[in-house]
Amino acid sequence: MAKKWVYLFTEGNANMRELLGGKGANLAEMTNIGLPVPQGFTITTEACTQYYEDGREINDEIQSQINEYIGKMEQITGKKFGDKQNPLLVSVRSGARASMPGMMDTILNLGLNEEVVNVIAEQSNNPRWAWDCYRRFIQMYSDVVMEVGKKYFEELIDKMKADRGVKQDVELTAEDLKELANQFKAEYKSKVGVDFPDNPKEQLMGAIKAVFRSWDNPRANVYRRDNDIPYSWGTAVNVQAMVFGNMGEDCGTGVAFTRDPATGQKGLFGEFLTNAQGEDVVAGVRTPMKISEMEEKFPKAYAQFKIVCNTLEAHYRDMQDMEFTVEHCQLYMLQTRNGKRTAQAALKIACDLVDEQMRNEEEAVAMIDPRNLDTLLHPQFDAAALKAAVPAGKALGASPGAACGKIVFTAEDAKNWAARGEKVVLVRLETSPEDIEGMKAAQGILTVRGGMTSHAAVVARGMGTCCVSGCGDIVMDEENKKFTLAGKEYHEGDYLSLDGSTGNIYDGQIPTVDATIAGEFGRIMGWADKYRKLKVRTNADTPADAKKARELGAEGIGLCRTEHMFFEGDRIDAFREMICSDTVEEREAALAKILPVQQGDFEKLYEALEGNPVTIRFLDPPLHEFVPTEEEDIKKLADAQGKSVETIKAIIDSLHEFNPMMGHRGCRLAVTYPEIARMQTRAVIRAAINVQKAHTDWNIKPEIMIPLVGEVKELKFVKKIVVKTADEEIAAAGIKLEYEVGTMIEIPRAALTADEIAKEADFFCFGTNDLTQMTFGFSRDDAGKFLGAYYDAKILENDPFARLDQTGVGKLMEMTINLGKPVNPNLHIGICGEHGGDPSSVEFCHKIGLDYVSCSPFRVPIARLAAAQAAIAEKQN
């Protein structure tokens, strides 16, 4: 039996997301529960994958099924493609299994040609509407299918409006729009070299190909990488009978949410435009009216719409984002999906759904994207400074948060300025999906047009970027990179501050303060802690970082990098003296100066952690990182050591290495300079003794971590120094103190010989930054130069330094556990690379049985939530 590539809406349901994509599955589900949905069919995600396998062509079998289903659609609707009496017009929309707002392409009014336009103009007695549909179709088809830029058509529209002395598209007459359609076709021919296609089936195949092709466009690829959506999923294509919101004042189109996507507040929230079509609301071409105003215009349709909203939220048990059209006062539902929301809204909605008995605690925890918590923990404006500030303008607060930066006018400039360390605010007439990388780079986004559901608003909310939209008071001059607001001219590089919660726009810079976390955060985190099995620690080198991490729920320090402490104040001078010493005695004298300050640092960390575990990594970087490079500093070091400048320079030159990341660093330093390991051990143990004496109810148990071990004899050598020194200190203090000595697993050989190393180690901690570097053979510092090409060539989908490579590096981790645990059942194992705060990596760590993950302080809540979700998912499976 031939494979099924196409499904009518009546043949699917909500559980078929993988095959029909989110939009197709939900259109089928809405059809099944009896909602007013214009009928159509879905071409599966498998057909998209097949399209790429067949060299970006739709094969005969799939084309044949599409034609068969056009016939079925004609029977259902009673209309025919290209018919002179009753023509069928359709929309063609993408629909991946994960929602990707604005990332892929849509075409409306497909099936039109000049003959059909004349038929529908006469039948409807509304020639203006007919020609409006046709000019829109030509523009969309040219842009999406033939890649003729929208701007050429926008210029023609602007010229037409200027010639006619009008401001809005809706003010153009039927004759104007007919003339515009002919101008558009001429523009198409001048750019493409052939006439605009008249055959509806040819149009349809072109549109379906274009949607499949858009799965691989740059903005979709960036969005997928950022949101962990595999390339292999593909997108479905939905072909749906058109309904028209642009047939007159008794028609309209809108987008609505069942709860406020910015705050989570229950209640209908959205926007509506009369005499408009499809993308008009989202595209921000006209600033729309509030959804509540629809009640006055279309009381019957609005009453029905409210019932539909309640039905859908109860059915999906989540906040819904819906698109709809009203045609001659009749309501039609075009889409529903679980709505994108801010982090604050996500927490409130999850808690409210539990309180409303629509969800249980585990489901509430599983609903929240851990990555979004990042946005909760970032600064807001200082309240006093904000009170004193006078807004220069006000628009819609489309995505909460505070942003301050220098004004830029293009996405490209935003990206380039941010790359050189500038904080920028991107100011645009309106954003489009092409602006995605610039939007990511910006601190905040300000648009002149568009509402709360415009592209800028939806994408900014998803990214957690502050956004203010629809500031119609701005007079924009993009060409000269300036705008005027409230009588003042702003130029590129001027400072601007945005409040994404209130929509206020401020001249200049307003200082920011750390965010305060709402009560729902505590509830969700409490539930997460109840269900997770993984412990969550933090990577912290200072008491301030440790304190912040504890506030955010860290249960210990998984990595304290001791080398960071050497750079503070005048201690770097003593460390440089140690490096440039000729004898062990000279080195020990220099280290003696460092010992008390390092001990003091450790005491403060133990105090901040209140008896929770602290893992201290001994010196790791190569020594050349600590030596001076400035002439003045070299002279100062020479004077301090009583040596000539030439001698110091010779020592510095001798430290140069061709491949320092694999050179004289980590445990190799302790082997060549055992006195460094002795000093660090004394500092760790003396600090622990002092804090234990001061807090007898705490259980201080230092964890000393030896870096870069690849051979068990290295660990034995350094461990012997540590144990001898530690035991001497403990005996001298006359106190009972336990400590552990473990190692980082960051060299592939350590993973391969983990059974030998486990006999000597009390714990393992995966240093996945170096383990990734050495497994791939990629330099962490240089990979950025070629990773972009790897993404484009589909060699890699994600940055392996940000998201754990589970296939290769992950296999080494599993091997380490399987070799180490049988030899040493008490061995505890964690991870302290950057991956410790990445949700998909945390899920993998849970799956392979790690005891803890460790991440930067602000990512602790992300790790806590991701760990809970991993445990809940495992239980459900």
Language-model segment annotations:
Residues N238, V408, V425-V427, L446, ...:
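Structural motif
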Residues M1-A388, E422-V425, S432-E437, Q443, ...:
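Nucleotide/phosphate-binding sheet-loop regions of phosphoryl- and nucleotidyl-transfer enzymes
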